[in-house]
Amino acid sequence: MKANTMFIILCLSLSTLCVSSQSTSVHGKIFVPNRAVKLSSDGNYPFDLSKEDGAQPYFMTPRLRFYPIGKRAAGEMEQSEGQNPETKSHSWRKRSVLTPSLSSLGESLESGISKRISINQDLKAITDMLLTEQIQARRRCLDALRQRLLDLGKRDSDVSLFNGDLLPNGRCS
């Protein structure tokens, strides 16, 4: 019973939120409570996503901009946006194809791939080094065990020194 009443209260509160966020008409004008007004890249063409100011439809469509990762990390996007030929014109008809941004994206992808390859090579070198150290430690352990058995005079042909089970804990004594 409590779950049903909670569900009904939740639905009613969500429906009132949805109704209050929609646009209302007063004296023939449309008022939108939360208007999303954005500026173009040069700041001269403000457009409203509610289409009240008669902006061109291609101004309202968001454009994807690709910047080199170095500029993003250094925070140089805002300063270099004025020199960028993609952001100087707004119209899709006047803009050229995104070849500069795609080439910079390709360069960053190539640098990421080369970094990943170098990291993989470093990891392989580290694992090889660890494996050779383990092999050398195992050989030293076997040599020490062989010497101890020889010293004690208990060298027997049935004893296998090259299996991995030297001691129950896997170490030399």
From Swiss-Prot:
S-S bonds: C141-C172
Q: Where is this region: Disordered?
A: 75-94
Q: Name one GO molecular function term.
A: hormone activity
What are the UniProt keywords, alphabetically?
Answer: Amidation, Cleavage on pair of basic residues, Disulfide bond, Neuropeptide, Secreted, Signal
**Could you tell me which InterPro entries the record lists for this protein?**
ELH
Q: Where is the signal peptide?
A: 1-21
The record's Pfam families line, in alphabetical order, gives: ELH
Main function: The atrial gland peptide A and peptide B precursors are the source of the 2 peptides that, upon release from this reproductive system gland, initiate the egg-laying process by exciting the bag cell neurons. These neurons, clustered in neural connectives near the abdominal ganglion, in turn release other peptides that act directly on the ganglion and also, via the circulating hemolymph, on many other organs to control the physiological processes of egg-laying. One of these other peptides is the egg-laying hormone.
Q: How does it assemble?
A: Califin A consists of a 36-residue large subunit bound by a single disulfide bond to a 18-residue small subunit.
This chain's protein is named Atrial gland and califin peptides
Q: Which organism is it from?
A: Aplysia californica
